[in-house]
Amino acid sequence: MTQARETATLGGGCFWCLEAVYLELKGVERVVSGYAGGPTRNPTYELVCSGTSGHAEVVQITYDPAVISYRELLDVFFTIHDPTTLNGQGPDHGSQYRSVVFYHSPEQKREAEGKVAELTAQRVWDDPVVTQVAPLEAFYPAEDYHQDYFRRNPGQGYCRVIVAPKVAKARKLFLEQLRK
């Protein structure tokens, strides 16, 4: 009997970075860049980038929990972005780039809150973890040109300078979890 697939929705800066990293992991079957967390229905990239929609750039990950656990997805998440920066990552600033875990179940909420508490207790960073943990109310896929962006545009400036180093870091730190 095949185990049901599960879904995780995470925001940690530009969705191109997260998408590129998660697409390389065993057990991850699909990654969709999109928007979540705001009241605006069917937001556009332009509206989200204006910072007025309330949405964050996120990725929605469909994964096989028999191959990769939600906890492992969170481990990657907290390694490839800075969860101590409020409303921004690197050159990207605004609430649309906030660090946020949108949970789909009470179990995911417990795991996410536990991971934040663990990192806070361990004092992994000098600054406190500001990652929000919130229920997913709605997810809106981003425009087609945002999907699989890094693979289709590896030479683009932002991809070379911002995305590629995060992918390289994940490849180094999560070698055992990479697709062959």
List each language-model region with its residue ranges:
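Flexible coil/turn and secondary-structure edge motifs
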Residues: M1-K180
